[in-house]
A protein has these predicted regions:
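Outer-membrane beta-barrel proteins
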Residues: 1-355
């Protein structure tokens, strides 16, 4: 058996044992499998099963007294559809971990928090750019999640030190809630790669507000290299009874472009709007989005524009188990960034259980 798998299993077993004696340690997870049909104009059509970032982890806290607490989280993604291989071609986050044995690192950190001060976190975690936007996606961590189908940019994907959604070698600060629902947060990533000869330490900052039926946020991220290396986003969601409406706009200062293709430029802005309605244990939703062309540094444009939409729904059997179905259609203006000119259609049906 792979050594990494053994170590992971031992860690989870140890956490479970600790949990019996200490209620502040919890074993948790999300298991999700879907059958996905993909139809690409000018490309291959396929039907596959995908594990959609199913994960198992453990987390806990220790009260240190005087209002100070220590906390930790260690989470691994597992590919239940084929645990002996890396994420398949339909997965968007193939660099979430090494993937050599079906287990990949997700959030893994340790930190301190104090009443009235907030919390400091050290390790691997979501940037201040990625974390607030996931709350606008009713199908987050599914095959048709927003970042997979162009409703959100590539800055919400991946793992690494160069502006990816999950930042490694990172320090994060989250403030306590103030002014009736406001928070500020930020990350600073240390450049641990000596081979690249660069001293760029990416960072991100953000703010959010949540009160009543309103949730709003704004955040900024940069690789701190100078030039085309940043992005800014704004988002809002309004919930009114059983209905919810949301919108989000990402302004590309070059970082969205650089993570999508090797061209130097900016202007590849992304926006989306959506709505959902809940009826008992059922939810239906619709989203529409667009991506803009890249403005090249040397002049001219690169035709990267597209339109995209998604229709979906789910039924909750309980608070922990649900079934869902989604359909998305992304229309590209030209052959760029690995996509052929035309449409990419994805139909997905899945089952999810949280514990």
């Amino acid at each position: 058996m792979n050594k990494k798998l053994i170590v992971t299993a031992m860690g989870v077993a140890l956490a479970a044992g600790m949990g019996m004696a200490n209620a502040d340690v919890k074993v948790y997870g999300q298991l999700d499998l879907s059958i996905d049909a993909v139809d690409v104009d000018g490309g291959s059509d396929d039907v596959n099963m995908n594990s959609n970032r199913s994960a198992v982890g453990f987390k806990g806290t220790e009260d240190l007294g005087g209002g100070l607490k220590a906390f930790f989280k260690v989470e691994y993604q597992t590919d239940m559809d084929d645990a002996g291989t890396a994420a398949g071609p339909l997965e968007d986050d193939t660099n979430e971990g090494d993937g050599k044995d079906g287990w990949k690192s997700r959030d893994q950190y340790i930190g301190l928090k104090m009443e009235g001060f907030g919390k400091l976190t050290f390790g691997m975690m979501s940037t201040a750019y990625k974390s607030p936007a996931s709350k606008l996606d009713p199908f987050y961590r599914t095959r048709n999640q927003s970042r997979n189908v162009g409703l959100q940019s590539s800055l919400h994907k991946g793992r690494g030190e160069e502006g990816q959604g999950r930042a490694t070698n990172t320090v994060r600060y989250d403030s306590p809630t103030f002014a009736g629902g406001a928070k500020v947060f930020g990350t600073y990533t240390l450049d641990n790669s000596e081979a690249d000869g660069e001293n760029d330490d990416p960072y991100s900052v953000g703010a959010s507000y949540k009160a009543g039926g309103i949730y709003a946020f704004a955040s900024y991220i940069t690789t701190d290299r100078g030039g085309n290396d940043d992005a800014t986003q704004f988002g809002i969601k309004y919930t009114m009874g059983d209905a919810a409406f949301w919108g989000m706009y990402e302004i590309d200062g070059g970082l969205i472009t650089s993570t999508s293709n090797p061209n130097l430029g900016d202007g590849a802005d992304v926006f989306n709007v959506g709505a959902s309605y809940t009826i008992g244990n059922n939810l239906v939703s619709f989203d529409y989005g667009e991506g803009d062309d890249v403005d090249l540094d040397g002049g001219g444009t690169l035709n990267t524009s597209y339109t995209t939409w998604r229709l979906g729904g789910y039924h909750k059997f309980s608070n922990r188990t649900r079934v869902y179905a989604t359909f998305s259609e992304q229309d590209f203006d030209a052959a760029v960034a690995g996509h052929n000119k035309g449409e990419q259609d994805i139909f997905s049906v899945g089952l999810r259980h949280n514990f």
